[in-house]
């Protein structure tokens, strides 16, 4: 006989969510694979036109006309659907936090078509749009199934996970991204549904693009232990450069707002500036995966590496600041690869065997992304899956940890959270539904909730703690129920109050804040 006050977790609930996750993953895999394929084909075509224009300049005039028309078209899309601006990841985070509301179908088709800005050669990535496309599909599935708000958010999460998985053939990174970057917690139903969706979407993507890893660099030798000390120095460099990236990216509106153009036509700037870049250096166009892949065959001269880094840093900022649909994942990884190649070449001058330069390319990609996104687990696993090698988990972890600490000491914040805060400050279309909803709140090791009775905590108003998920059990709560580390608190509230209540519980349960009150 079961203990009083406990509800047995039925296996069919998990199966129910797994099946929904598979459904979302299948649709997302198809849509994102078509999106990715369209961008690649368009990118190849654009590069070939620039190559031809060197001998027949009339083609450059044609490209200029196409860029102007594309800027008009994408600007019109952004004007009618502002939620497709940028990578889309801050919008998804805001949606899951209950701070933004979106029309999933409008976002889906306009974001897909708006991807022309990525295919046109701008220094933007496909991963952010892929995540938002997946999230839109998840939201649509939730409405199709007439799911309650809390279940719809799980499906949105699974869509985001499967979007990243299909974009990079990285299902584990897709799962970790949702848990580490978006939810900042571990919820059994979220990870189970998201994992099912990510695996399914990745299978579809592999069918389209084959089994070869996206950034396969060939055989990568294991880095000898004697070079691990140099990883600390590399981590410091990555942390500092990541902090600079954050500051410059967040300062871009100060530049664009001075232009005599409406915000939705800021894309004219990158669309016009891409013309001389495409004419002079067509191989540098796009998110940068071709540059990373080039390191698998040969090492570039240091002066060329520095030139490429400056070019890609500056124009990736200009591209993203224009408010066009496009992400920063791949551009960040490309910049990290250039930093790693530069550092590896310096190490060769100090006597290191050149065969290890590729190791530093891989390590720096993860470290630089960690410094900017403040999501080390996602960065490590993402790079591991993209290069197809498990030989570098230890050096990846070391460099990522140092880069994270250095960026933290400098005062850097996770870039997507900063972008979301800016979006919420400027967003005029955000709408709160005001519907009843539940959300999960984890009890962590650094929380004062650990070991506390429910009645002894000063809970916010307008909420109800309805149950606690502990392992596979769901416990109905009462005043004497003791909360423990690892518990997931299931809280009922109105969606309009959700962000405030989350923040209030976090503030009141923080050990740091508790100590400061004494």
Feature names for model-found ranges:
Residues 415-438, 510-518:
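Long, charged amphipathic helices and adjacent flexible linkers at domain junctions
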Residues 1-424, 428, 444-445, 470-473, ...:
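Alpha-helical transmembrane segments and immediately membrane-proximal extracytoplasmic
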Residues 444-501:
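Cytosolic Rossmann-like ligand/nucleotide-binding regulatory domains
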Residues 439-443:
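Short, glycine/charged-rich beta-strand-loop motifs at protein surfaces that mediate ligand recognition
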């Amino acid at each position: 006989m079961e203990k009083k006050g406990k509800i047995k977790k039925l296996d069919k609930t998990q199966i129910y969510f797994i099946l929904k996750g598979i459904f979302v993953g299948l649709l997302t895999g198809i849509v994102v694979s078509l999106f990715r394929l369209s961008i690649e084909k368009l990118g190849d075509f654009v590069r070939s036109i620039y190559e031809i224009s060197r001998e027949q300049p009339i083609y450059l005039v044609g490209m200029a006309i196409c860029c102007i028309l594309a800027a008009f078209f994408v600007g019109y899309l952004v004007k009618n659907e502002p939620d497709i601006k940028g990578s889309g990841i801050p919008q998804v985070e805001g949606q899951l936090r209950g701070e933004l509301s979106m029309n999933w179908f409008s976002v889906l088709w306009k974001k897909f078509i708006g991807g022309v800005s990525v295919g046109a050669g701008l220094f933007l990535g496909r991963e952010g749009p892929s995540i938002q496309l997946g999230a839109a599909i998840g939201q649509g599935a939730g409405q199709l199934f007439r799911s309650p708000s809390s279940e719809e958010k799980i499906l949105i999460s699974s869509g985001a996970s499967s979007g990243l998985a299909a974009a990079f053939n990285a299902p584990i990174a897709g799962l970790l991204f949702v848990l580490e970057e978006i939810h900042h917690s571990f919820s059994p139903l979220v990870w189970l549904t998201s994992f099912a969706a990510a695996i399914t979407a990745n299978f579809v993507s592999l069918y389209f693009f084959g089994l070869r890893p996206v950034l396969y660099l060939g055989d990568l030798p294991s880095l000898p232990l004697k070079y691990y000390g140099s990883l600390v120095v590399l981590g410091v460099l990555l942390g500092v450069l990541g902090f600079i990236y954050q500051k410059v990216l967040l300062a871009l509106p100060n530049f664009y707002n001075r232009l005599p153009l409406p915000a939705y036509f800021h894309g004219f700037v990158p669309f016009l500036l891409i013309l001389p870049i495409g004419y002079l250096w067509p191989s540098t166009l796009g998110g940068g995966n071709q540059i990373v892949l080039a390191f698998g065959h040969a090492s570039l001269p240091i002066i060329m590496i520095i030139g490429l880094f400056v070019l890609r840093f500056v124009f990736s900022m200009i591209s993203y600041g224009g408010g066009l649909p496009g992400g920063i994942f791949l551009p960040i990884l490309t910049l990290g690869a250039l930093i790693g190649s530069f550092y590896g070449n310096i190490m060769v001058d100090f006597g290191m065997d050149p065969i290890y330069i590729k190791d530093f390319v891989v390590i720096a990609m993860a470290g630089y992304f960690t410094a900017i996104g403040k999501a080390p687990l996602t960065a490590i696993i993402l790079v591991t899956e993209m290069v197809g090698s498990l030989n570098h988990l230890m050096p990846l972890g070391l460099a990522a940890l140092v880069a994270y600490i250095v960026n933290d000491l400098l005062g850097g914040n996770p870039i997507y959270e900063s972008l979301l805060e800016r979006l919420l400050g400027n967003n005029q279309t955000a709408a709160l539904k005001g519907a009843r909803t539940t959300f999960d709140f984890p009890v962590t090791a650094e929380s004062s909730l650990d070991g506390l009775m429910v009645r002894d905590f000063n809970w916010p108003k307008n909420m109800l703690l309805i149950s606690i998920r502990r392992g596979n059990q769901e416990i109905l709560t009462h005043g004497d129920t003791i909360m423990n580390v690892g518990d997931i608190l299931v809280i009922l509230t109105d969606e309009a109050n959700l962000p405030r209540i989350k923040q209030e519980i976090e503030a009141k349960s923080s050990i740091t804040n508790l100590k400061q009150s004494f």
